[in-house]
Amino acid sequence: MLLWLAEYLQQYISAFAVVKYLTFRAILGVMTALGLSLLLGPWVINKLNKLQIGQSIRDDGPESHLVKSGTPTMGGTLILFAIVFATLLWSDLTNRYVLAVLFVTLSFGLVGWVDDYRKVVQKNSKGLPAKWKYFWQSLAGFTVAYGLYVTAQIPEETTLYIPFFKGVALELGVFYIILTYFMVVGFSNAVNLTDGLDGLAIMPTVMVGSALGIIAYLVGNANFSAYLQIPYVPGAGELVVYCAALAGAGLGFLWFNTYPAQVFMGDVGALALGAALGIIAVIVRHEIVFIIMSGIFVMETVSVILQVASFKLTGRRIFRMAPLHHHFELKGWPEPRVIVRFWIITVMLVLFGLATLKLR
């Protein structure tokens, strides 16, 4: 939004030309989102407390979690507001990739908001019925997948690139829509499953989102992409602003979500952030690298799948409790230890993922 104003004012004051630079707008984006999160956080938490929008805790979960009952939830609305506001302020709103990511963020955020509202306000323990939750997620996922497919301007936009190997790629054709759907819906639910401990989901989200911002900047630059021998996707660099806003909003939220949490993000935050990461990974054509960097989200999801499959087939559980973070809690690990160790794992995976950009 301010980019348009700066372009107009540039003809009178040349200093406004600096606003055109992606790095400058990314810095302003992270500062704007971080500032909004920190400033509005106390007000949001107080408002949620007054409205008695508190988290209910499962009776069959770890006993240490019972003290969390009543902690304000739906704090993801703060994250999404900060991200969307900063993105609208500092990004190029004519860029179709920015619009696609904003659509995914808001649509999945709405699904999560309805689910949270039914649980904590209407006191419906099941929230939004699973079939309807997946229906609306699928509708949004297929919509953005189809939209990106039919508006693709170059073959690189719908090609799957394999890391580590130079020139190894698969033209997906219509299967691009299917891949995009699973990336968006799958990681939306993966982040939601991970969001079970204080700060456990938001910090890996910030780290992976920041790494995707770096990748977006590189693939959106013809010189850098040619040097690194990675796909060049014109316009993808504009997502740096969104990723910066995500990092800022996430860090601001972590200020209040760190152990012991003053607020939880709820489904409104987790579903939206996971879906946003998934669609950005697709746009920048680094799906496999993204899956590597998101190893924590993948492990949490796989642990649930294995647990359910094992119990249905054999009547036995593989883990003491799923998702995986609860397994370690029941083994006696204090919650902060589980959280920080999962963060450390994410740091290593993100660094490895970024290193693959040079490994060919």
UniProtKB/Swiss-Prot annotation:
The disulfides recorded in the entry are: none
User: What are the GO BP annotations of this UniProt entry?
Assistant: cell division; cell wall organization; peptidoglycan biosynthetic process; regulation of cell shape
Q: Which Enzyme Commission number(s) are listed?
A: 2.7.8.13
Q: From the record, give the transmembrane residue ranges.
A: 26-46, 70-90, 97-117, 134-154, 167-187, 199-219, 236-256, 263-283, 288-308, 338-358
Cellular component per GO?
plasma membrane
The entry's keywords:
Cell cycle, Cell division, Cell inner membrane, Cell membrane, Cell shape, Cell wall biogenesis/degradation, Magnesium, Membrane, Metal-binding, Peptidoglycan synthesis, Transferase, Transmembrane, Transmembrane helix
* Locations listed in the record: Cell inner membrane
A GO molecular function term, named singly, is: phospho-N-acetylmuramoyl-pentapeptide-transferase activity
Report the cofactors: Mg(2+)
Q: Give membrane topology per the record.
A: Multi-pass membrane protein
Question: Which chemical reaction does it catalyze?
Answer: UDP-N-acetyl-alpha-D-muramoyl-L-alanyl-gamma-D-glutamyl-meso-2,6-diaminopimeloyl-D-alanyl-D-alanine + di-trans,octa-cis-undecaprenyl phosphate = di-trans,octa-cis-undecaprenyl diphospho-N-acetyl-alpha-D-muramoyl-L-alanyl-D-glutamyl-meso-2,6-diaminopimeloyl-D-alanyl-D-alanine + UMP
UniProt-listed Pfam families: Glycos_transf_4, MraY_sig1
The protein's superkingdom reads Bacteria
Pathway per the UniProt entry: Cell wall biogenesis; peptidoglycan biosynthesis
- Supply the enzyme class, top level: transferase
The protein's matches in CDD domains, at most eight in alphabetical order, are given as:
GT_MraY (cd06852)
Q: Does the keyword DNA repair apply?
A: no
Give the protein family.
Belongs to the glycosyltransferase 4 family. MraY subfamily.
Give the protein's biological function: Catalyzes the initial step of the lipid cycle reactions in the biosynthesis of the cell wall peptidoglycan: transfers peptidoglycan precursor phospho-MurNAc-pentapeptide from UDP-MurNAc-pentapeptide onto the lipid carrier undecaprenyl phosphate, yielding undecaprenyl-pyrophosphoryl-MurNAc-pentapeptide, known as lipid I.
Among PANTHER family, the record links this protein to:
PHOSPHO-N-ACETYLMURAMOYL-PENTAPEPTIDE-TRANSFERASE (PTHR22926), PHOSPHO-N-ACETYLMURAMOYL-PENTAPEPTIDE-TRANSFERASE HOMOLOG (PTHR22926:SF5)
Official protein name in the record: Phospho-N-acetylmuramoyl-pentapeptide-transferase
